[in-house]
Amino acid sequence: LLSMVRPLKFILKFIFVTSTLAFIAGVAALYFEKQNQTVSRVYNELRPNLIQGGGQQCLSAMSTAGIKFVSLGDVRDKNCLIKNAIRINTLPNTKLSSPLTLNCRTASKLVTWLDEIEAKSIDHMGTYNCRKMRGSPIMSEHSFGTAIDIARINKASIKKHWDNGGVEGNYLHRAAKSAYSHFSNVITPDDNALHHDHFH
C-alpha cells in the first residue's frame, strides 16, 4: 500500500505544480496582452501627429522638379491619416508599375533616391493602405502614406536576385545601402522572412 501512496503523492504534486505554472502563464499572457494593447493604442493615436507632410513648400519643390502629381490634401480613413497626400501617376526618369499615393515629403525622398540609384523602372506592391502591421496591433507605416513596398528595380528582382551575388544582386544591395541615407526605416530580405521578396 505504501508503494502505491508515493506515486500518488508524486502525481498530485506534479498536477499542482503544472496547474500553478499554467495559471501564472495565463495571468502573464493577459498582462502583456493588455500592455501591448495600451502601447499600440497610444502609438496609433500619436503617430499621425509626428508625421511631417512637407506643406506647400514640398508641393512647390515637386512641381519645380517636373513631377506630375495630384494634390489630395490630408486624407483620413478611420485610424489612418496621410498629411499632404499626393498621387503620382508618372515620373520623369522612372517608369512606375502603378500610381503612387504617399505624403509629399516621403514622395520627394523616394524620387531623389530613385534618381540616385538610376532606377529606370520599378515594380511596387503598394503604398498607402489603411491597415495594421502583420501580426501586430500597431498601424503600419502604409497607413500614413510613408511607406512603399518595392519588388523590382530595373531588371533586378528582390525575390530572385537579392541572394544570388550577381550583377542584379549587387545592384540591389547598393540600392538598399543608398536608401538608408534617405529613409528612417528600410527593411530588406536580410531583416525578416516577411520581406523576402521586397524592400519596405
Roles of regions detected by a PLM:
Residues 44-123:
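Active-site acidic/histidine clusters and adjacent loop/turn architecture
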Residues 22-40:
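Membrane-interface motif at the C-terminal end of an N-terminal transmembrane signal
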Residues 13-14, 29-33, 70-89, 123, ...:
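Catalytic cores and adjacent binding grooves of peptidoglycan-active enzymes
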Residues 3-21:
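N-terminal Sec-pathway targeting helices
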Residues 3-4, 38, 50, 54:
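Non-membrane alpha-helical secondary structure
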Residues 102-153:
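Mid-length scaffold segments of soluble, non-membrane domains
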